[in-house]
Amino acid sequence: AWRFYTIPGPGEPGNDTWADDSWMTGGSATWVTGSYDPELNLIYWGTGNPGPDWNGDVRLGDNLYSDCVVALDADTGELVWYFQFTPHDVHDWDATQIPLLADTEYDGEQRKLMLWPNRNAWFYILDRETGEFLNGRPYARQSWAESLDENGRPRRVPDTFPSVEGTTVSPSIGGGSNWFSPSYSPLSDLVYVTAYDGETTYFIRDDEYIAGERFTGGGGTTPLPQDSYHAALRAISPQTGLTQWEYPIQPRSTAGVLSTAGEVVFGGTMDGYFYALNSSTGEELWYVNLGSRVHAGAMSYAVDGVQYVGIAAGNVFYTFALDD
C-alpha cells in the first residue's frame, strides 16, 4: 500500500543532514515493532542508528531519520512529524524501542503523550499529536549530554565521541535500556523500565563499506566487570520524568516489563528469576527461579474467567495463576 524510507534520498527533506553520499550506506533500520493510535490514525515507529555505528567522521550531520521516532499517516505513509533523540549518533544507541502511548495529565491538562525511556539514558515526554517535546530527564547513568534544550536537542559534553585510543562514556554500549519493552500503567500513572547504569570505552576505526559485510567503524569494551554496575527496574513519573522507586536487579536484566490491572508489575532477570512487584510501591510480592535466563517479556491472558501470566525462559514457556 505504501512505503516510508527512513533515510531521505536526494531532493527530499533531510537528505542534506548526510555528508556527500553517506546516506547510501546510512543504516537507520527499523527492527522493533512500533505503536498505533486509532484515534489519530498515526503509526509511531522507532529507527535505528546511522552507519557506520561509531565512526561519524564519514557521515557528518544529524543523519535523519536515524535515532528518531517517526509518526506516519496509517493510510498513506506520509510523514506527519518526527523527533530525533540522538542527532549524529556515534555510540550505537539508536531508537528501536516500543513507543509508549499514554492519555494522562500533563501540566494541568489532559494530553496524548508519548513516553520514551531511550537507550541514550534520557527519558522523553512528547505530545504524540504534534511531536512537541515537553520534558526530558536522565533515568539511567549518562555522561554524554549536559542537558536538553527547549526542543529536546542534547547539549553534548565535549570529548565524549569515540576515539582511536578509546573514550569511556555512559550509558554502556547496551544503553540505559534497550529493545526490551517498557510498560505504562494508567492505574498508577507510572512508566516501568528495565534500566542499567554502566559505561563503555568506545573506539573508532576506518572501515570500508563492502555490501553484505559488517560496517561498524569501531566498537566498544566494558572497562569494569559488568556485575560492578547497577541494574534496576525503575518506575518513572510521566509528568516529571523523575524516578519514583526502583527495584534493584543483580545481575542485569534484558527482559521486558508487564503491568496489569491488578496493580502488579512482572519482570525477569538474566539469572533466571521471574518476579512480581506492587506497581505503586515497588514492594516485592513473590519471585521464582525458572532455571534459565529470562529475556522475554511476560504476557497475560484469561481463559474461562481465570487470569494467567506467561513467561518464556530458555526453551520452556511457564504459566502462572492464582489459587482458587
Please state what every model-predicted region is.
Residues G27-V32, E109-Q110, A121, G175-S181:
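Short alpha-helical segments and helix-capping/turn motifs at coil-helix boundaries
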Residues T6, T47-N49, A195-D197:
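Short, well-ordered beta-to-alpha junction loops that form the rim of enzyme active sites
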Residues S35-N41, T47:
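Active-site cores of enzymes that catalyze phosphoryl transfer or operate on phosphate-rich substrates
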Residues S35, D159, E165-T200:
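Long, low-complexity segments enriched in small/aliphatic residues
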Residues L64, L115, L187-Y196, Q250:
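Active-site core of glycosidic bond-cleaving carbohydrate-active enzymes
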Residues A1-M24, E39, G56-A95, A102-Q110, ...:
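Extracytoplasmic/lumenal domain signature
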